[in-house]
Amino acid sequence: MRVISRKILRDFGESHADSCDALYDWYRVSSKAEWQNLIDVQQIYPKAESVGNFTVFNIKGNRYRLIVDLVYVSQRIYIKYVLTHAEYDKDEWKNDPYF
């Protein structure tokens, strides 16, 4: 799959250095994947879940949440947000018009 907005991962990694390796691992795996549906995603990331129109990944043992828009037909992943668990729990990201 083609990952769009990788800059969001890099920027988050700069302010949360302990996330860098886990985010890079997710990027490496996801960019080589050919997922067709959430079940395919969950074979690699069992805790990935669909929330609204987004897919949410637990990163670094659930310390961070990666929120993406997976478009299976075009094989694209649009990175929307990377949040700490506390930021995720505030649900402000759910104000995204695409949610």
What feature does the model see in each segment?
Residues 79-83:
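Catalytic Cys-His active-site segments of thiol-dependent hydrolases/isopeptidases
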Residues 1-63, 71-76, 86-99:
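Basic, Lys/Arg-enriched alpha-helical interface segments
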